[in-house]
Amino acid sequence: MAPPAPPLSRSFSLYLDVCRFLAAVFVVLSHFPQYGAVAEVANPWLHLGRESVVVFFVLSGFVIAYTTERKNASMREYCIARCTRIYSVALPLVLLGFAGAAFLVVDGFAPPEQFYQLGKVWLYLPMHLLFMGELWTVSEPPPLLAPYWSLGYEVWYYVLFGAMFYLRGRRRLLVVGALLLFVGPKLWLLLPVWASGVAAYHWQKKHTIARPLALAGWCVTLALLVAFKLAGLDVSLRMLVLDNWPFAGLHPKSADRFLADYLVCALVVTNFLCAKNADFSALLRIERPVRWLASYTFTLYLVHALVMRMWLAVYPHRQSDPVDVLSLVVVIVSMTSLIGQVTEHRKEWFEAVFVRLAARWPRRAATQ
C-alpha cells in the first residue's frame, strides 16, 4: 500500500473549517424568511441555503477521502468513525424532533395531521435513524428537522465510498451495484457533487497552482457565485429541470436543483483548490475561535430548524420586531451550545458504543 499523503496545511484546514461554519450560518439565514421569522426579501445572502448544502457535500467528500486514507485502515475503523460522527448528533436531534412535535400536538399548538409521523413512530423513527427518507420516491424529513434531508444523501454516500474503498473485485461490483439500485435516482443525481470532493482531494495531492493565479481564481469563484445568484440562474435551472423532467413517476423532489448544484459544485471545488494554494496563513491568528465555532457546525445545522419551528409555533413572533428576531437568534445560539455539549463535544460516548458493537463484527468481514 502506498504511504498516505502528508497532512493538510493548518491554514488550508482552517479555511475548510471557516467554509463549514459559514455554510451552516447561511443555511440558518435562508430559513429565517422561509419559515416566516422575517419578511421575504430579495437579498441573495438570505437565500444561499441550497448552495451551502453543496458546500457541505463537496467538503464531506474531500474530508472523507482524506481521513480514510490517513486514519481508517480497515472497514471496521471506517464504520466506527462515520457512525460516531453522524449518530452523535442525528440520534439526539431526531428524538428531540419527535418529542417537540408531540408537545406541539398535545398542547394544541399544531393539528395532529401536521405531524402525522407521530401516529406511526414505530415506522418513521427507524426510517429516519437509518437515513431512508430520500430513497427513490420518498422525501420525508423527521418532524421539525427539515435540513435532515441532506443526511439521507450524505450517509449513503459514506456507505458507497466505504464499499468502493475497502472491498475488492467481484464483491465490490456486486455491493456497489446493489447499493446504487437500493438508493434510487435522486441520490444518483447528487452523487457527482459529493464525489467531486473526493476527486478534489486526490487532485490537490499531485498538483499545485501558482499563488497569484490561485488568489485570482479564488476571487473569481466568489464573484461568479454572486453573479449566479443575482442572475437567478438557480431558479431558471430548477424550472428547466421541472419543465423537462421525463419520468412522471419518479419526480426528482429534493434533487430537482441538480443542474444548478453542478454549477455551484464546480465553483466550490475550484475555490477549494485555489484556496489550498493561496496560502491564507493569516487565518492562523484566529485558529482557536475558528476551530471552536466549527465544532458546533453539525449541531447548528439541525438544531436551528427545531428551535425556529418550535419558537414560531408557541410564541407570538413579529417579523418586523428586531427584538423578537434577535431573541430567536439568541435562543438558537444558546440551544446549539447546550445541545452541542452532549452531541458533537461528547462523541467519545457514542464511539464507545460503536466500538463495542464492532467487537461483535467478524474480523474477516471488517478487513475485506
Regions found by a protein language model. Give the residues of each.
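Membrane-interface alpha helices of multi-pass inner-membrane proteins
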Residues: 176-185, 292, 296
